[in-house]
Amino acid sequence: MRLEKPMKGAWHAAARTAAITIALAAPLAAQVTPGARLLVPAPGNDPIPMGTTRGEHATRLVIRNATFISGRGTPGTNRAMPPEGPVDIVVENGRIADVVLLDPVNMRSARGADVRPKGDREIDATGMYVIPGLVEMHAHLPGGRRSALGARGHEYAFRLYLGHGVTIVRDAGSDAGIEFLREQRRLSNAGEIVAPRLVLCQRWPLPLRTWNEGNTPEKARLMVQKFKELGADCIKISKSPGHYPDVMAAAAAEGKRLGMHTMVDLKVSESDARTASNAGVRSIEHFYGFPEAGLDGSQSFPPDYNYWDEKDRFRWAGRLWQEGNRHPERIEALLDLLVKNGTNWDPTMAAYEDNRDLFRGRTLPFRETLFHPSYVDVLPDSTTHGSYHSDWKLSDELSWKEFYRIWMGYVKLFHDKGGLLTAGSDVGEAGGIFLVRELELMQEAGLHPLDVIKIATTNATEVLGMKEHCGIRVGCVADLAIVNGNPLDNFKVMYGRGYGFYGILPRGEREKHGGVRWTIKEGTVYDAQALLREAEWYVQQERQAATRAAGSH
């Protein structure tokens, strides 16, 4: 093939065009508007007293040079939108007001016009990714005088959440009580405290040790009405009699009438996931009720099994998926039913991970700095829920490894069928950190990181009925996390204080890499890493207090 030699003038024109394109393809300078304030992280890396960091309010905030992941997708599918950028994102009055494209094609079409938006507060997000604020769908918030996390445990927890980009937390029942958390919700909504937005599910039955409250459909409706009067946003069915099928259906129906959705922890009960979905429950937690669909009869419990002995409960739970998976077609039919009914599955895989690798949980790098001492120092204790590893064997871990393999396969299958997945950690002592871990486990299950971000953001707000929290789109509430790195390439960048690079980079260098740099809640900007430094300070104070108390005995 003979190539025509271009005319000299045409060649120069082509060269000029190529030069312009190459120049525009390079990162654009963060052109700060004269008179605007460029927000920069707090200096230093040491812990700082809790209460030091405040939210930054702006009339018009511009996030410059960002790549964003919208968290949105095609309606009726689980297909998520890919990254877009570079862009300038404009936030006004707590809403996303504009997204200005700065890619070479669009900048060339601007023909030199000043297209860069201006603001009174600006963030240089060059090299960073902006995602919608994460939603923790299964928390147990601390608070009140009985909190194991200390008198300011709720403030500490709020900082762990915001420090990891979590802007909405659904509480699934707390020892702090609805009255205490209702006030925290009010203060958070008013912007008077540093906290994520709170969605409060009242746990039922309450107290948990009694079964004579709400044990008929009529009593259940009255109890739900009482929850509404107390200020609950939703209902958490945790044990019997809420597990009685007729009672569950009555509670879910009354909740729906009052604008309250129902979440349920089925445990091993009269109701399974099929019963709960057909009863109108909005959200099914954990794994209970799913593998049972594949059983021919009862699970093969030993004669001396006792469900309320937690070591028995979780030792034999580790064999449940293996038994249920003998009839995968039955479990697949169950998943089809949930998809048809629009029932959400919130699997909380992070909550059980110690069961498959106990040493992993005991050697996490942030245990000494971000975990409260009451969580780190606890030994197996039969009087404490979840503290049952006193005689945990390799055989138990191997059972749970296989359990996870099968469980994750069905989580992936549910998603592939169009099912509504969300992300919750169920680890109230270290919120935020374990939500990131939950998202890693979803990727281990085979989900694409884009899908995982959608699951943890707009899927969750769909379940919660928060239509205005609709991801990154003009008009949506500006709940955002600005990440110092690309979570699609390495989700470890979501861990705060550089812990995603533990053992790879020196301590003094880790903090410069990864982590959520800024968390934005309805337009209010928080220095995420500074909030985690406050959490570190609180852990230090609590550890010193515990040491003093031990020395006085």
Predicted regions and their residues:
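C-terminal helical cap
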Residues: 66-68, 391-392, 399, 404, ...
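Divalent metal-dependent hydrolysis catalytic cores, especially in the metallo-beta-lactamase
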Residues: 157-178, 195-206, 228-243, 252, ...
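Bacterial N-terminal signal peptides
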Residues: 15-29
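Active-site neighborhoods of metal-dependent hydrolases
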Residues: 223-237, 290-445, 541-542, 547-553
